[in-house]
Amino acid sequence: MLGRCGGSSILGGKMLIPLKIEGYAHQRFLRGCIMRDRVVIKWGGGLITDKSSLCTPNLEVLNQLASTVAECHAAGQEVILVHGAGSYGHLRAKNWRLNEGHIPGMLQPEGSICSSQRDAVEQVRREMLELNQHVCDVLNEVGISSIVHPPHQWATNTGMNFRGDLGRFNHPNGRKIHITFGDIVEVEGEQRFGILSGDDLVVRLALELPRVKRLVFAIGGVDGLLRVPPEFATEDDLIEIWSPDIEFEGVHQSDIDVTGGIGLKAARGAHVAAHEIEVLMVNGGKPERVLAAMLGNPVRGTIVTNKQ
C-alpha cells in the first residue's frame, strides 16, 4: 500500500518501489509500470434490475454505481466488476428450468417466446448481453471504458470449480475495467448447460488474480446480513461481523431466483475471506457506502469472515 512503506523490496528478481503520488494511494510501481491494487465488486442482479418485470434495468441505481467505480478508479484502485442477472435471466431461466440442465422432452411453458430449452439458453444469453450493455453505457458516461468477458464464450461447467482461463482479466487495462456476469454456460455430460453464478465467478477472480485486496457485494434493499427477516429488522439487527457459525435471515425469492440468493453470497464470501482477503456486504442503494467499502474505509455493512 502506498504511503505505508518507505523502503523497497525484491519480488521475483524485480524491484518493487512503493511511492506516494497525490490521489493514488493504492498503487505500486513495477519497473516503471503502475501496479494497482484490485477490488472485485459484485452488483447484485436484484439491485440493478426490476426483478418483477422481465428485462427491466434500474437505470437510477446503475448510474449511481457507475460513479462509485469512477471514483474508486480515480483513487488508484483497479476494479473488476461482476454483475448479476436479475430480471434479465432469472425469470426465463426459472420458467425453462435452465438451472437443472437439459430436460428431455420438456414442454414449452405457456406464453414463452422460446420453443425449446436450447432456444431459451440462447435467448437468456442475448438478454444478458443487453443488460451488460446498459452497464457499459453508464460506465462510459462517467469516462470508464469496459472490456467484457461473457462467460458462455470462455467458461464451461458451473459452481466454484468451473473451467476457464482467468488470465484474460489480468491484461493491463489503463482507463478500462474488466467486466463479467452470471451467464448460462455449456456443461460437460448429459446436463449440457447450466447457470454459472456471478457469486462463483467472484470467488475465482478474488483468489486467482494478483493484488486483489477486497471483495465487495453490493446488495439490494438491506444493509448487510440480518438477524431477523428484513421486513422486521431495525438498525440494531445488522450483523456487523459474520462467520459461518452465525445464523442470519435473508430473502431468497425462490419463485424467481435460480441461484442461491444471499446465502450463496455469504458462503462464497467466507471462502474468500479464509484466504486473507477482505469481504464486505453493503447496501448497493447507498452509493457512498459502496464506494467506502471498495476503498477499504469504515462503512455500515457486514464484514464476512471465516473465523468460527
Pin down the residues of each PLM region.
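N-terminal amphipathic/basic-hydrophobic helices that include classical n-h-c signal peptides
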Residues: M1-I34
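Nucleotide/pyrophosphate-binding catalytic subdomain
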Residues: G23-Y24, F29-E278, G284-A292, P298, ...
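C-terminal accessory domains and tails appended to enzymatic cores
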Residues: T302-I303
